[in-house]
Amino acid sequence: MSTYATHESSENYLESILVLAMSQQVVRSIDIANLLGFSKPSVSVAMKHLREEGMITVDGNGYIALTEAGMAAAKATYEKHVVLTNMLVRLGVSAYTAGQDACRIEHVLSPETFEKIKEHYLKQPGIEDSAEYQKLQTIRNFVQTVPGRQD
């Protein structure tokens, strides 16, 4: 597996753990497998890799939690996904295609490029009153409520 593919895969798993953690009390490998449509053995291999990289912890019950580094990476990836998806939808791209394209683009953008895209996106008229802006705030608020974590 190439470095890019490994990086993209890791970011997708971390993003999935964050999404699940925002909607349920505990995250297990089976939850990730169901969300992504992957086999449980594939997810288990990925979780082992993420644990070795210091991105997640797995307790005795098999519950998965993001470490500080994992949370930062997951938040960054998810924020890119939300901003890019909604920017593309505002440009007239269908929601499905926008989500698929955002998932591919989010892994290759430099931090500088993403910040400029986000700045432009946040200047759109009425954005602060929109559901998509509220989703960004939810990400920020969730990350700040995780013990030991700060945005």
Feature map (PLM): residue ranges:
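Alpha-helical DNA-recognition elements
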Residues: 49, 104
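The short coil/loop that forms the "turn" connecting the two helices of the helix-turn-helix
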Residues: 37-38, 61, 93
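Key DNA-contact positions within bacterial/archaeal DNA-binding proteins
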Residues: 41, 96
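C-terminal regulatory/oligomerization modules of transcriptional regulators
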Residues: 106-151
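N-terminal helix-turn-helix DNA-binding core of bacterial DNA-binding proteins
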Residues: 4-38
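Glycine-centered, phosphate/nucleic-acid-interacting loop/turn motifs that mediate DNA/RNA or nucleotide
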Residues: 54
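Basic, amphipathic "hinge/linker" alpha-helix immediately C-terminal to the N-terminal HTH DNA-binding motif
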Residues: 62-80
